[in-house]
């Protein structure tokens, strides 16, 4: 009886550890101090003065980089963030923001890159996208994370049956012991640290 309890405890502990390993966490650099930073740009832009001073977290693609006296201004085309605060690929832009970072950031290292920024909202300013007037939300960045794109090969699911012999007609058709035609693999682009 005691052996059974120990086995069950071991299985439960292993299952719990496996479940925890699948959890996605926000990197420390962009955690911020608020448990729920503002992430809805449409809501913020409807009344930006109400959100001044509140912590926000936005991410997307850096469209432009302006080096100014003592700071760098990133123009970011924002997209929704996933549970790990990574920009979601393939989503349309929700709008643009200016993210002011203290110090110098080299435009070569940031233009066209995916980033997530966190910090207090400082207001909204008028600007332009091309020749079109646009109102940008502005935030003071207290932390940022630059992301990388990686391609992964995704194989189709394999049969689970260890005694799977192959297609109908074996051994006269295709296959033999353990043969399985998985079909084409697909290449998927993912955002990684």
Curated annotation (Swiss-Prot):
Q: Where does it primarily localize?
A: membrane
Q: Which PROSITE patterns match?
A: PROKAR_LIPOPROTEIN (PS51257)
One cellular component (GO) term of this entry:
outer membrane
What the entry lists under InterPro entries is as follows: OMP_Slp (IPR004658)
Q: Where in the cell is it found?
A: Cell membrane
Question: Which residues, if any, are the signal sequence?
Answer: 1-22
Lipid-modified sites (S-diacylglycerol cysteine): 23
Q: Which terms are listed as keywords in the entry? A: Cell membrane, Lipoprotein, Membrane, Palmitate, Signal
Membrane topology annotation: Lipid-anchor
Instruction: Kindly list the residues that the UniProt entry marks as N-palmitoyl cysteine lipid attachment points.
Output: 23
Query: Is this entry keyworded Cell membrane?
Result: yes
Q: Cross-referenced NCBIfam families, in alphabetical order?
A: slp (TIGR00752)
Can you say what this protein is called? Uncharacterized lipoprotein YeaY
Q: Which gene encodes it?
A: yeaY
């Amino acid at each position: 009886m005691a052996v059974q309890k120990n086995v069950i405890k071991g299985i439960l502990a292993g299952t719990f550890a496996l479940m925890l390993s699948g959890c996605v966490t926000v990197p420390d650099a962009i955690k911020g101090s608020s448990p729920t930073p503002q992430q809805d740009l449409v809501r913020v832009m409807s009344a930006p003065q109400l959100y001044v001073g509140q912590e926000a977290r936005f991410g997307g693609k850096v469209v432009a980089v302006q080096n100014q006296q003592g700071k760098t201004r990133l123009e970011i085309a924002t997209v929704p963030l996933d549970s790990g605060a990574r920009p979601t690929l393939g989503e349309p832009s929700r709008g643009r923001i200016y993210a002011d970072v203290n110090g110098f950031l080299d435009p070569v290292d940031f233009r066209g890159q995916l980033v997530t920024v966190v910090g207090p909202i400082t207001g909204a300013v008028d600007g332009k996208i091309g020749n079109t007037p646009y109102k940008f939300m502005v935030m003071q960045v207290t932390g940022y994370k630059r992301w990388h794109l990686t391609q992964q090969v995704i194989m189709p699911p394999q049969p689970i049956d260890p005694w799977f012999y192959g297609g109908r007609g074996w051994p006269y058709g295709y296959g033999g012991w353990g043969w399985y035609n998985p079909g084409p693999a697909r290449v998927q682009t993912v955002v990684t640290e």
